Regions:
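Oxidoreductase and adenylate-handling cofactor-binding alpha/beta cores
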Residues: 30-43
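Short Gly/Pro-enriched turn/cap motifs at secondary-structure boundaries
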Residues: 21-25, 48-51, 102-106
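C-terminal active-site/capping subdomain that shapes the small-molecule cofactor and substrate pocket
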Residues: 61-158
Length: 158
């Protein structure tokens, strides 16, 4: 009995800290992450989950050599700033004020904040959102609004 209890305590303690998954680089979203922007090489994508109520942070790392010739992180920032003006997805620069990006920053919201950080050689694309709102339930509400002829964001906390 003691050995079994000890094994359960060790297992439970593993769930206290954040855990990374998708380590084999076969994450189910990689295909769409390549298809939608037209990437020829899949990015490195290994999300991290943790035991807290809501919120999620995802990141995709890029090397400058993966960009079109002559393009830089500043070009990505400019494209994000032009494209993601809200209310559902908003670009923020800098991503955070204190050097730490919290996965819970958008908890309770049905919107998403995207950012670009890094340097001239290594670029990090990040998104922060509430996985409960911006996920399936938010999408269901957007679809319902579309069918009912309402504004897409009706009933969402953007």
């Amino acid at each position: 009995p003691y050995r079994r209890q000890r094994q359960m305590c060790i297992r439970d303690s593993l769930y206290v800290a954040p855990r990374q998954y998708g380590l084999a680089q076969q994450h189910k979203h990689l295909r769409e992450m390549c298809a939608i922007p037209g990437l020829t090489h899949a990015p490195v994508f290994a999300p991290i989950v943790a035991n807290f109520y809501s919120g999620m942070e995802t990141s995709v790392a890029l090397f400058a050599s993966q960009l079109c010739p002559g393009k830089t992180a500043e070009d990505i920032k400019a494209a994000y700033a032009a494209k993601y003006t809200g209310p559902v997805v908003t670009y923020r620069d800098p991503a955070c004020d204190d050097g730490f990006l919290s996965a819970a920053a958008m908890s309770g919201k049905d919107s998403m904040v995207v950012s670009v950080s890094g340097n001239d050689e290594r670029i990090l694309l990040t998104s922060v959102f509430d996985n409960l709102g911006k996920g399936a339930s938010g999408a269901a509400l957007e679809c319902l609004n579309l069918v009912m002829g309402r504004e897409k964001g009706f009933g969402l906390d953007l």
